[in-house]
């Protein structure tokens, strides 16, 4: 976590003469809206954005209203999430995951559990005996806005274990936890530092300089000021009115509390959160700053590479400058009064420290021993936070107890602290045109940083430093100056004698000449005066008219660029590679498109893996083949189980086959991977056959959730269910709430799976939507005139479905699925309380 801090503002102002005239307030003004973005084929909406034309300053009003507008539209392109996944498994959402994660007992499809939806017990291979993740692990997957210091929406799927079974032990909780597949390392280690660190700053200008991180963009000489603390924006907002009236010194007292430390995996191995993956899919393949800027607003500028979990405390107190001046309190005296055994957390009787207490009380407008401050607290229980907003000067034990109570609660409710960041564009992958979108997101991030460059602000007087906060500019004043524009007071000491120059914003890029374009800036914001220093850096810069990376991608992925620049002819599907596949296979292959082959597990590719769609609409494929490097199992027939289960086996390893219950094995049971990479004995004629049973005298009558197989009633598979009533169900094994149907619940219970109707916890059931004839559920019929499905009357039910118990208007009654569906179709609120008929009422 950022340091826990007690910040004391010490004013050193006596009487000031007015140095400059007051600046008139400047109100924020919006610029015009940009054109509408391309219509999104998935959401069928388009957006547009308006930038700030004039930032509010000198006490002027901020801009009011939203930056974005959204409207419905008719798309001309399809939805990328509806495309296939090639050799990978496709979740219901459209996200692709490795087939090795299917039927492993974990829900690796984040929102829909599609990878576990159609698994028979004989197919399910639980990869671990533990599924409990570390507490608060979801915090490690959040995005982060480095400009505002705020955490944003989740970008990493912290719920997926990636098929791994890595465990970590918590000595505090005395329990084992299973690590997410995205986390490389997670350590439970509580670090509490009881010694506070004290730093003094002679002005808000010095403090702003220290607590900001300079970042130079790819545009040489451009400097952006980033907030390094999540509380910085709040600090400037809450102290703005006070800092207009006096010049203050600052004393910062720092400390840290940590409860756990984590390191996330490298970008190429991270699984994206489904919502973030969808937004990446929705991004247009053409550069549209509004669309990419909206993604930055939602998910931030960076993701977490590593960090700790803990809490943050910062409180600001103001000190009467005249009282401090009268007491002749020097810098060392102030530090001693706020540290060691005479800290504000402890009692002090020294004369000069008593004078500092009086100065604190005078600035607070109170004569009591209770000092109210401006707190900034992250982490810990909210009930303890309110007690950190004040100090009792005569009750150091009480101060210490309130602090200790809050610090102890950080273990239960931590936040991410001490984070190390990686740019968000590193996560752009696994979506169509990923390389192009990654480059565009990087470009959008630079434009986003440009919006917050202080060059947009008018100069502060007396050498003050301007910064952009939202839609306003704030001035941070040098020592002995104050006011909304730092217009009051005088510069003294090292700061007197001159005003350093500041850069204007870069101009727009000029026209291309000889393959290059140029832009410029001036050192006039403000110009240097009174012997001040000139700006550091170049007044102009040039670059190639066409981005080299973009040109390279235009060759590799021409289909991601405007249609006027790409061919309209396509190659057929690429030739198949024995024991191999095409990486990230798509549905169309325009002229110039390159593809890359890979081999299945147990094989290694020999030769050139790249093939190209030529102008003759034929594939140019070099010599390549997949060379066997291990023994691989053939496709196993239904019911046949292998042990150990591995994607491939090295020389000398054995595999043993067995059959599920009710089946017997025909053929050898154990096989050896030989030096020739062939199985010994040869793997053929190995199968599971049903054990002989006496012939049934008559065909049994099966339940609705059963089917007849080999003269026996067996459980159906969930996908064999037809139209059935939607319900919310709870998986008692994973404790997840899922959307199922009455039929699927019967089938799963028949298979021995423990699903119950959820009580008090709901899922999102599909709303009523128009369906074409041929897709009507039990409770709807086809309207010949409109060719659409419409609600039946209860008396028109042709297929009853299951008999269920339904609560209608507070009363339970038994009815068929069709009858219940009719009520729901007509808009009545019904609740399925049991997938079986209601229990008879007691007489």
Swiss-Prot record:
<feature type="disulfide bond">
    <location>
        <begin position="337"/>
        <end position="353"/>
    </location>
</feature>
<feature type="disulfide bond">
    <location>
        <begin position="460"/>
        <end position="475"/>
    </location>
</feature>
<feature type="disulfide bond">
    <location>
        <begin position="797"/>
        <end position="818"/>
    </location>
</feature>
<feature type="disulfide bond">
    <location>
        <begin position="659"/>
        <end position="688"/>
    </location>
</feature>
<feature type="disulfide bond">
    <location>
        <begin position="455"/>
        <end position="505"/>
    </location>
</feature>
<keyword id="KW-0180">Complement pathway</keyword>
<feature type="domain" description="EGF-like">
    <location>
        <begin position="457"/>
        <end position="487"/>
    </location>
</feature>
<feature type="disulfide bond">
    <location>
        <begin position="433"/>
        <end position="560"/>
    </location>
</feature>
<dbReference type="Pfam" id="PF21284">
    <property type="entry name" value="C7_FIM2_N"/>
</dbReference>
<feature type="signal peptide">
    <location>
        <begin position="1"/>
        <end position="22"/>
    </location>
</feature>
<feature type="region of interest" description="Disordered">
    <location>
        <begin position="105"/>
        <end position="142"/>
    </location>
</feature>
<feature type="compositionally biased region" description="Acidic residues">
    <location>
        <begin position="107"/>
        <end position="120"/>
    </location>
</feature>
<dbReference type="GO" id="GO:0031640">
    <property type="term" value="P:killing of cells of another organism"/>
</dbReference>
<dbReference type="InterPro" id="IPR040729">
    <property type="entry name" value="Kazal_3"/>
</dbReference>
<keyword id="KW-0325">Glycoprotein</keyword>
<feature type="disulfide bond">
    <location>
        <begin position="128"/>
        <end position="165"/>
    </location>
</feature>
<dbReference type="InterPro" id="IPR023415">
    <property type="entry name" value="LDLR_class-A_CS"/>
</dbReference>
<dbReference type="InterPro" id="IPR000436">
    <property type="entry name" value="Sushi_SCR_CCP_dom"/>
</dbReference>
<feature type="domain" description="Sushi 1">
    <location>
        <begin position="569"/>
        <end position="628"/>
    </location>
</feature>
<feature type="disulfide bond">
    <location>
        <begin position="42"/>
        <end position="79"/>
    </location>
</feature>
<feature type="disulfide bond">
    <location>
        <begin position="457"/>
        <end position="473"/>
    </location>
</feature>
<dbReference type="GO" id="GO:0006956">
    <property type="term" value="P:complement activation"/>
</dbReference>
<keyword id="KW-0964">Secreted</keyword>
<feature type="disulfide bond">
    <location>
        <begin position="571"/>
        <end position="613"/>
    </location>
</feature>
<feature type="disulfide bond">
    <location>
        <begin position="523"/>
        <end position="535"/>
    </location>
</feature>
<feature type="disulfide bond">
    <location>
        <begin position="599"/>
        <end position="626"/>
    </location>
</feature>
<dbReference type="InterPro" id="IPR036383">
    <property type="entry name" value="TSP1_rpt_sf"/>
</dbReference>
<keyword id="KW-1053">Target membrane</keyword>
<dbReference type="InterPro" id="IPR002172">
    <property type="entry name" value="LDrepeatLR_classA_rpt"/>
</dbReference>
<keyword id="KW-0473">Membrane attack complex</keyword>
<comment type="similarity">
    <text>Belongs to the complement C6/C7/C8/C9 family.</text>
</comment>
<feature type="domain" description="TSP type-1 2">
    <location>
        <begin position="500"/>
        <end position="549"/>
    </location>
</feature>
<dbReference type="GO" id="GO:0005615">
    <property type="term" value="C:extracellular space"/>
</dbReference>
<feature type="disulfide bond">
    <location>
        <begin position="85"/>
        <end position="96"/>
    </location>
</feature>
<dbReference type="InterPro" id="IPR035976">
    <property type="entry name" value="Sushi/SCR/CCP_sf"/>
</dbReference>
<dbReference type="Pfam" id="PF00090">
    <property type="entry name" value="TSP_1"/>
</dbReference>
<keyword id="KW-0391">Immunity</keyword>
<feature type="disulfide bond">
    <location>
        <begin position="477"/>
        <end position="486"/>
    </location>
</feature>
<feature type="domain" description="LDL-receptor class A">
    <location>
        <begin position="83"/>
        <end position="121"/>
    </location>
</feature>
<keyword id="KW-0245">EGF-like domain</keyword>
<keyword id="KW-0399">Innate immunity</keyword>
<dbReference type="Pfam" id="PF00057">
    <property type="entry name" value="Ldl_recept_a"/>
</dbReference>
